[in-house]
């Protein structure tokens, strides 16, 4: 009886959030460091539940550690410059193979196996339908591009058909040449183009920490201005800066809220979006909690 009462209380707490976000777009970015078979299954269940209550969920994934692993298995050495992967033509082929041919297919398969009836997830590369048009970064990085345009209608049409897009972040220039795109930046660009209500980054950290060495120092809420100040004063871990900057830019460009949560915690997405306390860090443009 106690368990049943607790379950009822959880559902009652979730109801206002379900009503508020029904019909709204939610962009979920899954980092390569948070990819794990059991966690992917829990994430699939979360995505399906959010979809079932009317949210329009788009999943964007990275895969850096998996690309590194494949490169080493092929006798190649990963190279980075200012946190970005130097992407030669040979490296680009490995990136496409891992992101599009392996991780994307695995995530789509996991979601569809968890679906109660017919499959609902569909894999999409940024190359498909001109979803991500990119311009090259500096030539020393090779085939690394910045998103210059998002054709959000590609995703909107899939969502309108009741499908859940799973996006791998390979884009192409206007001539059709593929480029490697930073997944955090691609997720931000897609969320802004879609007019998303929320963008959620699932990471291998609890969220933004006041003290990077203390996982109990989680910052639960802050504004984009406060976030920029922390980045400027280098009071955050260096590896989090691209995600933090993407969050601030997203909310400043019209996304309702940005969230950084611990993707290692099963069902972290539901806890963050459908409970009062949440589980990670939430960023808004204005301080109207």
Predicted regions and their residues:
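Nucleotide/pyrophosphate-binding catalytic subdomain
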Residues: 1-264, 271-273, 277, 285-289
């Amino acid at each position: 009886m106690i368990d049943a009462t607790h379950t009822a209380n959880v559902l009652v707490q979730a109801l206002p959030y379900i009503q508020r976000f029904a019909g709204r777009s939610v962009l979920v970015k899954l980092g390569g460091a948070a990819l794990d078979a059991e966690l992917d299954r829990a994430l699939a269940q979360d995505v399906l539940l959010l979809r079932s209550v009317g949210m329009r969920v788009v999943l964007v994934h990275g895969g850096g550690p998996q690309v590194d692993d494949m490169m080493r298995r092929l006798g190649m050495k990963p190279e980075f410059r200012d946190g970005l992967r130097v992407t030669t033509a040979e490296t680009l082929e490995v990136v496409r193979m891992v992101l599009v041919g392996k991780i994307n297919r695995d995530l789509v398969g996991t979601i569809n196996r968890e679906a109660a009836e017919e499959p609902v997830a569909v894999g999409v590369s940024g190359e498909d339908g001109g979803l991500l048009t990119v311009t090259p970064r500096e030539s020393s990085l090779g085939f690394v591009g910045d998103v210059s345009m998002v054709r959000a209608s590609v995703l909107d049409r899939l969502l309108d058909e009741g499908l859940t897009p799973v996006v791998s972040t390979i884009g192409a220039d206007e001539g059709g040449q593929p480029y490697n795109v930073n997944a955090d930046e691609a997720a931000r660009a897609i969320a802004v183009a879609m007019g998303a209500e929320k963008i959620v980054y699932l990471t291998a950290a609890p969220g933004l920490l006041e003290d990077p060495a203390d996982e109990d120092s989680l910052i639960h809420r802050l504004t984009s201005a406060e976030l920029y100040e922390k980045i400027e004063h280098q009071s955050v871990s260096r590896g989090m800066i691209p995600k933090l900057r993407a969050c601030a830019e997203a909310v400043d460009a019209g996304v309702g809220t940005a969230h950084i949560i611990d993707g290692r915690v099963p069902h972290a997405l539901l806890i963050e979006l459908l409970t009062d306390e949440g589980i990670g860090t939430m960023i808004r443009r204005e301080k109207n909690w």
